[in-house]
Each structure stands twice: as C-alpha cells, then as structure tokens.
Regions:
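Extended, charge-enriched "interface" segments that sit outside catalytic cores
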Residues: 1-112
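Short glycine-rich loop/turn motifs
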Residues: 120-123, 173-175, 189-192, 217-218, ...
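Internal maturation/activation junctions in enzymes
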Residues: 151-192, 196-199
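A short core secondary-structure module
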Residues: 200, 204-251
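Acidic, glycine-rich active-site loops and adjacent beta-strand->loop/helix elements
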Residues: 141, 149-151, 162-167, 180-183, ...
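Short Pro/Gly-enriched beta-strand edge/turn motifs at strand-loop
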Residues: 172-178, 202-203, 249-254
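Internal helix-loop-helix
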Residues: 76-170, 211-213
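Buried hydrophobic positions in well-ordered alpha/beta secondary-structure cores of metabolic enzymes
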Residues: 143, 176, 194, 203-205, ...
Length: 254
C-alpha cells in the first residue's frame, strides 16, 4: 500500500520502486527468465520518469514548440523548434528503450520476444511524467512494424538501420500522417494524391492531424492516380523528411 502522506512531491522518486501494484503485475505477468533482466530496466525508467523527465515537464509545459516557417533568406524551412528540455527528454527516452528499440534488440539477442506488457508498463510510467510526449514517442515502433511487413528490400535497407538504431544521434524517429479534414477514420474519403514520376512518387495533399510532426520517417496514406474509388484505391507510403541529397522534401507545416 502506498502511503502518499510521506511524499512531499513525486518528482525525484523512482516511480517503479514506489508503485507496488506495478511491481506485482510485472512479477505476475512476466516469465521469470524475462523478469530477471527486465526489472532493472523498468527500475531505470522509473528513475528517469520520476526524476529528470517529470522535472523537465514542469518547465516545457510552459514553453510550447515553435514553428519556424522560413530561414533568414526567406527560403522554406518548416522546422519545429523545441525547448532544450524536451529534446533532452526525447533523447533519454530513446536511449532507455522507451521510444527507441534497445529493449527489443536486447530481447532478440537473448533469443526472446519483448513481452507486450513491458512497453505498456513503460508508457504507464511515462504518461504520469510527460503525457504530451507519449503519442510522438510511440510512433517509431509502429513505423518499424509497417516497414518490416510491407516495404520492399531496398527501402528496408535504407530506413531500418536508422529506425532501429540504439543511439539517438544515429536514429530516425517515426511519424504517422493519416487524418484529413474530411474525416479521421473515414479513409475512403481521403483526398491526398500520389503520382508516379520515374522511380519516385510525388504526393500532393494535406493532413489535418500528424503524430510526431517533425519526425524523420513518415508513414502516410495517399490515392495513386488511376486508383480505385474508396478504400481499395488507398496506398501506404513511407516519406523521408529529408531527401538523400540533404534537401528539404517539400513538406510544409502550418
């Protein structure tokens, strides 16, 4: 039982260690072989969420991201600038395996699959510390799953080393741009188009709600020219924010 009266503030505490119910559920749901190596990781994230992540959130909540449309010369930039505290949290979460693939990779090295209850526990702790970041940091694993399942080999070779990088500086985070003004769940009304141009596709349209708007690898939906009406004419695309030559990929943020 948690005696809340002994806490002046939750910030500065380990949010795994002070949560007996979370510890109980991990012992109950995890195989003992997994629990032995995963509990130290859970404890590490508990200290991270209860410490620097929660402390930074007190500051970053008062400093919203800033959209910079143009550079000093008037050329399109469309860059989202974050408070340094938000970037530090993003880095810490990636390195700890909350948003990055480190724990999945470690489980694979052990010949295991990472139990689904573990990401749930990590997100449970993060949601109490920095709820505003929970959506964006959860996008990368979804994009990884789509690339592994649907992308041709040459696309996988280009994207997967970055999407699965364990170190933040080498990593590309994922995003999902799906919702349009015509409706969030009615994909049959999607209006974004895709036109073939040699070995590339040119997408034209607008998305209304973008999860992790400034991420590097964007999963999105568009309707190829000549495609069928309704859902059967919708296709899935993977869009890099930056082209191979380092140039801006024509994505405009409003």
């Amino acid at each position: 039982m948690i005696d809340y009266a002994e806490f002046q503030s939750a910030i500065g505490l380990n949010w795994y260690d002070i949560d007996p119910n979370l510890q109980l559920q991990m012992r109950r749901l995890l195989d003992p072989a997994d629990f032995d190596w995963l509990e130290p990781e859970l404890r590490k994230v508990g200290a991270l969420c209860g410490g620097p992540v929660a402390a930074r959130a007190e500051i970053t909540d008062k400093h919203s991201p800033e959209l910079v449309k143009f550079d000093r010369w008037g050329d399109p930039l469309d860059e989202v600038r974050h408070h340094p505290g938000a970037l530090a949290t993003k880095r810490d979460l990636w390195e700890a395996g909350v948003s990055g693939p480190r724990l999945y990779n470690e489980a694979r090295r052990r010949g295991r699959h990472l139990p689904e209850v573990v990401p749930t526990a990590l997100n449970y702790m993060l949601s109490q510390a920095e709820i505003g970041m929970l959506c964006s940091v959860g996008m990368t694993s979804g994009v990884i799953g789509l690339v592994r399942r649907f992308a041709p080999p040459e696309v996988q070779r280009e994207f997967m080393p970055h999407l699965t990088a364990e170190h933040f500086d080498d990593a590309w985070d994922g995003a999902m741009f799906m919702t349009e003004k015509t409706g969030g769940s009615d994909l049959a009304t999607l209006t974004t188009t895709a036109r073939r141009d040699g070995d590339r596709w040119i997408l034209n349209g607008s998305k209304w709600f973008c999860s992790s708007v400034d991420a590097s690898a964007i999963a999105t939906l568009a309707r190829p020219d000549g495609g069928a009406e309704g859902l059967r004419g919708v296709a899935l695309f993977l869009v890099p924010r930056i082209r191979r030559d380092g140039s801006h990929n024509g994505i405009s943020i409003r």
